[in-house]
């Protein structure tokens, strides 16, 4: 799949789910805030409880760019964690390496953040980690590899060009953009994680 095809797919998915998954999708979604297709402008019929919860699960999956298997694993892990299952799910997903690369402003989209990790541009505590699903622990530092910092995408990131299209840096990250370095200072709290989701609906979907 080419970058253009991937971009179009993300825009279409954004409109179907009712959330902007990329900066380009945000621009288009503002102009056409309805589902794609011939009947996109018509009012959506009353949905079943199942359909509502299914869409909420799909929204969460899309925002983290993960597979069904990965999301279900986060749910299963959450059921064995103290506290509310949904909050535990969000905290777990938010500590993914690719998610934090995006939150720090090193990348513009989730897909780009994942690509940077897979292509071995990202260090965790000085060591290359090429698994997007790697869970970063409080106190650990992520940084763009010194050799990679000369690349145009990272030079742009260091200048803060992505900050206008990304949510504000969350309180659990201490970011030094010029150095392309960020530290996870503590566990993320569910209410401060910048994703659009009714997490209880997701829990109810899997618990049914």
Swiss-Prot record:
Keyword Nucleotide-binding listed: no
Residues covered by the S4 RNA-binding domain: 95-155
GO biological process annotation, one example: ribosomal small subunit biogenesis
First and last residue of the signal peptide: none
Source superkingdom: Bacteria
Keyword Ribosomal protein: yes
An example Gene Ontology molecular-function term: rRNA binding
Annotated Gene Ontology cellular component terms: small ribosomal subunit
Keywords: Ribonucleoprotein, Ribosomal protein, RNA-binding, rRNA-binding
Family statement drawn from the similarity comment of this UniProt entry: Belongs to the universal ribosomal protein uS4 family.
Summary of subunit composition and partner proteins: Part of the 30S ribosomal subunit. Contacts protein S5. The interaction surface between S4 and S5 is involved in control of translational fidelity.
NCBIfam families (UniProt xref): PRK05327.1, rpsD_bact
Name of the molecule in the record: Small ribosomal subunit protein uS4
Organism of this sequence: Bifidobacterium adolescentis (strain ATCC 15703 / DSM 20083 / NCTC 11814 / E194a)
Gene responsible for this protein: rpsD
């Amino acid at each position: 799949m080419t970058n253009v095809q991937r971009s179009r797919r993300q825009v279409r998915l954004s409109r179907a789910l009712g959330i902007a998954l990329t900066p380009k999708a945000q621009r288009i979604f503002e102009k056409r805030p309805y589902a794609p297709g011939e009947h996109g402008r018509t009012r959506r019929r009353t949905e079943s409880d199942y359909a509502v919860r299914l869409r909420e699960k799909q929204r969460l999956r899309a925002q983290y760019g993960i597979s069904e298997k990965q999301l279900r694993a986060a749910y299963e892990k959450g059921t064995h964690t103290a506290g509310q299952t949904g909050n535990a799910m969000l905290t777990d997903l938010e500590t993914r390496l690719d998610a934090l690369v995006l939150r720090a402003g090193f990348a513009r989209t989730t897909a780009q953040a994942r690509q940077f990790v897979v292509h071995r541009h990202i260090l965790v505590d000085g060591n290359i980690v090429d698994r997007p699903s790697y869970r970063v622990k409080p106190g650990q530092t992520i940084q763009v590899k010194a050799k990679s910092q000369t690349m145009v995408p990272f030079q742009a990131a260091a200048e803060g060009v992505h900050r206008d299209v990304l949510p504000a840096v969350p309180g659990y990250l201490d970011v030094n953009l010029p150095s392309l370095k960020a530290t996870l200072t503590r566990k993320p709290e569910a209410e401060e994680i910048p994703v659009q989701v009714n997490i209880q609906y997701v829990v109810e979907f899997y618990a049914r």
